[in-house]
């Protein structure tokens, strides 16, 4: 258990270091818990959140017990891309936050790529 957590933290710090070098673009940050998925577009130079989407939003929320699945990740990816376009953002840096680029994270990224570029 400890080694898995350590690997996660190492991946997270490695990714954040790479992202900090591309400071001219905003970042699309992804977080997932056991039940929900969250996505935010953050401008690190101004320290503000420009747009956000999650499975807690009324447009996505259903009566299911767990909302952390690929189907909802696609909905969140499309929703965050729509909000980014309305805010005038065309390019972002994808911050997967230490998660492996597989499954839910990949589905969210692919859905967001339909309207914004990484």
Swiss-Prot record:
- Keywords assigned by UniProt, alphabetized: Ribonucleoprotein, Ribosomal protein, RNA-binding, rRNA-binding
Has keyword Lipid biosynthesis?
Answer: no
State the Gene Ontology BP annotations.
Answer: translation
Which GO MF term does the entry hold, naming one? structural constituent of ribosome
Which SUPFAM superfamilies does the protein's record reference? Translational machinery components (SSF53137)
Q: How is this protein annotated for GO cellular component?
A: cytosolic large ribosomal subunit
Q: Which CDD domains does the record match to this protein?
A: Ribosomal_L18_L5e
- Asked if Endoplasmic reticulum is a keyword of the record, the answer is no
Similarity section: Belongs to the universal ribosomal protein uL18 family.
Quaternary structure, from the entry = Part of the 50S ribosomal subunit; part of the 5S rRNA/L5/L18/L25 subcomplex. Contacts the 5S and 23S rRNAs.
The record's annotation in PANTHER family points to: 39S RIBOSOMAL PROTEIN L18, MITOCHONDRIAL (PTHR12899), LARGE RIBOSOMAL SUBUNIT PROTEIN UL18M (PTHR12899:SF3)
The free-text function statement in the UniProt record for this protein reads: This is one of the proteins that bind and probably mediate the attachment of the 5S RNA into the large ribosomal subunit, where it forms part of the central protuberance.
| Protein name per Swiss-Prot or TrEMBL | Large ribosomal subunit protein uL18
Protein source organism: Rickettsia typhi (strain ATCC VR-144 / Wilmington)
């Amino acid at each position: 258990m400890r080694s898995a957590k350590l690997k996660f933290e190492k991946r997270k710090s490695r990714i954040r270091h790479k992202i900090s070098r591309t400071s001219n673009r905003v970042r699309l940050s992804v977080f997932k818990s056991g039940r929900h998925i969250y996505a935010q577009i953050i401008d690190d130079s101004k320290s503000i959140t420009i747009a956000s989407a999650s499975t807690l939003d009324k447009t996505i929320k259903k009566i299911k017990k767990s909302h952390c699945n690929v189907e909802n990740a696609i909905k969140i990816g499309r929703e965050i891309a729509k909000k980014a376009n309305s805010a005038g953002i065309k390019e972002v840096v994808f911050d997967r936050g230490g998660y492996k680029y597989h499954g839910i994270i990949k589905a969210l990224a692919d859905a967001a790529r339909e309207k914004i570029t990484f």
